[in-house]
Amino acid sequence: MNEGQEMEEQFALLLETLKNQQMNEFRELFLALHIYEQGQFYQSLDEKDRQHLYNYLSPKELADMFDVIEEDNENMKDYLAEMRPSYAADMLAEMYTDNAVDLLNMLDKSQKAKYLSLLSSEEAGEIKELLHYEDETAGAIMTTEFVSIVANQTVRSAMYVLKNQADMAETIYYVYVVDQENHLVGVISLRDLIVNDDDTLIADILNERVISVHVGDDQEDVAQTIRDYDFLAVPVTDYDDHLLGIVTVDDIIDVIDDEAASDYSGLAGVDVEEVSENPLKAASKRLPWLITLLFLGMSTASLISNYESLVSEASILAVFISLITGTAGNAGTQSLAVAVRRLAMKDEKDSNFGRLILSEVLTGLVTGAVTGLTIMIVVGVWQHNLPLGFVIGMAMLCAITVANLAGSLIPMLMDKLGFDPAVASGPFITTLSDLTSVLIYFNIASMFMRYFV
C-alpha cells in the first residue's frame, strides 16, 4: 500500500468517526496526524462535517492546523464565517500573529473589527500593530512571537527564558540580544547556548554582526536576504534599530511561491488572483492590456498595407510573414523570461546593465544565424529559389536579434522606472516583435527583390 492509499484510508476512517459523532475516537485519530495532513482532511469536509469538527477541537488545536493551511486559499473567509464568532476569535488569538493577520486581511473592515472586538486588548493590540504595515513589506509578514534576551544575562538565565517562552515563539533556533531600550545588539544560536557553560555571560559569546531587515523593506528583498545568508529567520527593526519582530523561512517560502505565481501570470498580462474571480471581473482586468495591444497590432497591419505593392509583385513574400513574426516573438519571449528571472534574483554578477544587453544580443545573433541558415536552405530547396531563401534567412537573423534585444531591454527599463517588469513587459514583447519583424522583413525583401522575382 502506497502513502496516498494509506492516507485515503485514514481520512475515510476519520470521516466515519466524525459522522458517527464518536468524539474520543475522532480526536485520537485526528491529533495523531501531522498538522499538514489535518489541514488536508479539514479542507476535504463539507460544512456540516466541519461543524462537528469545531465541536470536537479546541480553538488552540484548530489554530495549529490553520497556521499551515495555504493563506491564499479562497475558502479561508468562508471557514471563518461558519464558526461561532467567539470560537473564531479564540482561534485567531491562538494562531501565530502573522498568520492571524494574513487571515484577517482577507476580510472587509466590519468583519475584521468584529473579531478584533472579541479579543483581549493585548491580543488585539499585537494584531492591529501588524495590520498597519504596508502590504508585501517585512512588517506585513513578520511575527512578533520570538525570544529575546539581554547581554548581561548568563547562559543559565537565557536558557530559563528560552524554556519559558519557547511554546509561544515561532522559532527558537536564533535568540536575539537587545539592550534595555530594545535596540538589537546581537544574536546567539541555540547551539551556542547548549555548548557553553551555564555561568558564561551572553555578552561574551553573542555575535554582534547581526544581519537584519527594515520593517518597510519589500518582501522580495527580505526573501533574498534569507536566501543569501541561509537563515532560518531574520530580525526586523525600525529606523532606530528597535527589534520589532522576525521573518521566518516558512513565511519566505510563501513569498517566493506568491512572487513566482505573480511573475508567471504577469508574463501573460493577467492577474494571479483571477482564478477566484467571476468572468466579468477577470475580463475587466485583462481588457486594458488587450485594447492597448490591439492598437499596437493595428500599427503592424497598417505597416503591411504600406508594402502592398511589394507583396503584389512578389506574392510569395506573404507566405513567410507569420513564420518570421512568430519565430521572432518566441525568441523575444525567451529573452524576456531570462531577463525577468535575473532581475528577480538580483544576482550581483548579472546586474550589470550593459553585460546583460550584450549577452542577449550575442545570443540573438547565434540563434538567429542558425535559424536563418536553416530556413534559407529549406526555402531555397522548397521554392527552388536560393535568393528568396537568403532574404527569408537574413530577415530571420535580424528579427530574432532585435527581438532578443527588446526582450532584455524592455523589462530592465521597466524595472528602472519602478514598474513590475513581468507585468509591464510581458504582453508587449510579442506585439512589438511583430511590428519590428515585418519592418525588417519587407525592407530586406525590397532591397533584394530583383534577385528572386
From Swiss-Prot:
Span of domain CBS: 142-205, 206-262
One GO cellular component term: plasma membrane
Residues reported to bind Mg(2+) 3: D102, A140
Catalytic activity: Mg(2+)(in) = Mg(2+)(out)
Binding annotation for Mg(2+) 1: E71
Binding site for Mg(2+) 5: Y176, A233
Record topology, Cytoplasmic segments: 1-286, 330-360, 411-427
Extracellular side: 308, 382-389, 449-453
GO molecular function: magnesium ion transmembrane transporter activity; metal ion binding
UniProt entry tagged with the keyword Metal-binding: yes
Keywords from the UniProt entry: CBS domain, Cell membrane, Magnesium, Membrane, Metal-binding, Repeat, Transmembrane, Transmembrane helix, Transport
Subunit structure, interactors included: Homodimer.
PANTHER family (UniProt xref): MAGNESIUM TRANSPORTER MGTE
Name of the protein in question: Magnesium transporter MgtE
Species in which this protein is naturally found: Enterococcus faecalis (strain ATCC 700802 / V583)
